[in-house]
Amino acid sequence: MPVHSREKKESNHNDMEVDYPENEGSSSEEDDSDSSSGSEEGDSSEMDDEDCERRRMECLDEMSTLEKQFTDLKDQLYKERLSQVDAKLQEVKADQAQEYLEPLANLQENMQIRTKVAGIYRELCLESVKNKHDCEIQAARQHCESEKLLLYDTVQSELEEKIRRLEEDRHSIDITSELWNDELQSRRKRKDPFSPDKKKKPVVVSGPYIVYMLQDLDILEDWTTIRKAMASFGPHRVKPEVTVKIEKHQHSARSEEGRLHYDGEWYGRGQTICIDKKDEFPTSAVITTINSDEVWFKRQDGSKSKLYISQLQKGKYSIKHI
């Protein structure tokens, strides 16, 4: 190499200086040696520059060659990888690649499992809907049967009450006829200006006392109530002088289109009400039927009773919403 040759020459020159220290006798020889060493140094510097340039060119050539080889290898590697990918893609399309077949088998297995589970879930949903439909049908039938029984009981109670009232009317027909005769006589006397009893003072009577200012139906109901009370207490419990006072109409009560209007409020079937009677504790009940002259209700213990609208008008009973 140029640098090594130069160092070798310098080392040789030093050896020469060391080898001839004793030849100090001739100065001419020293001058010749100095001139020869100077020429050799000039030639060696020129050779070193040429060698450096030549080596630089060689290095550049080698670098370009290596870059070309690297580029060729990179292109070759890209083509090989591309060919491998294309081959693998063809295998996948042909269902032959193991990397594709194994996940595909897992996916198909999962699909079969999920399809089976979905089928079972569908059957369960259908069964649940069918059971719900059957339950609704059964509930509707039971509701219909209960409504039929309730309607039957209501109609039966109404008919029995009408039969009972007819029986009572049949037994008390003679009494009512006497009442009618008395009423007619009293009207005739009021119309007759020359009647001697017109200015007669009121007579205090004992026993049931009936006010004839009421309607005929109210009189009949009051008389029936009095007879029931007398029959329940018995003849030995009846006090000798008891005056029954009929209260005047103090409340507004009427039946319109299957509803009851009482003291400015409307009451309908199925509503829960509180029934208040004098000298008794209030009770809650549910309205079952509203007729033209009576209201049927059902108590909490299951017993059924009725109220006459005239009783509400007189204030014997009072009702209110709960």
From Swiss-Prot:
<dbReference type="Pfam" id="PF08598">
    <property type="entry name" value="Sds3"/>
</dbReference>
<comment type="similarity">
    <text>Belongs to the BRMS1 family.</text>
</comment>
<feature type="compositionally biased region" description="Acidic residues">
    <location>
        <begin position="17"/>
        <end position="51"/>
    </location>
</feature>
<dbReference type="GO" id="GO:0042826">
    <property type="term" value="F:histone deacetylase binding"/>
</dbReference>
<feature type="coiled-coil region">
    <location>
        <begin position="147"/>
        <end position="178"/>
    </location>
</feature>
<keyword id="KW-0175">Coiled coil</keyword>
<dbReference type="InterPro" id="IPR013907">
    <property type="entry name" value="Sds3"/>
</dbReference>
<dbReference type="GO" id="GO:0070822">
    <property type="term" value="C:Sin3-type complex"/>
</dbReference>
<keyword id="KW-0804">Transcription</keyword>
<feature type="compositionally biased region" description="Basic and acidic residues">
    <location>
        <begin position="1"/>
        <end position="16"/>
    </location>
</feature>
<protein>
    <recommendedName>
        <fullName>Breast cancer metastasis-suppressor 1-like protein</fullName>
    </recommendedName>
</protein>
<dbReference type="GO" id="GO:0000122">
    <property type="term" value="P:negative regulation of transcription by RNA polymerase II"/>
</dbReference>
<feature type="coiled-coil region">
    <location>
        <begin position="50"/>
        <end position="99"/>
    </location>
</feature>
<keyword id="KW-0539">Nucleus</keyword>
<keyword id="KW-0805">Transcription regulation</keyword>
<comment type="function">
    <text>Involved in the histone deacetylase (HDAC1)-dependent transcriptional repression activity.</text>
</comment>
<keyword id="KW-0678">Repressor</keyword>
<feature type="region of interest" description="Disordered">
    <location>
        <begin position="1"/>
        <end position="56"/>
    </location>
</feature>
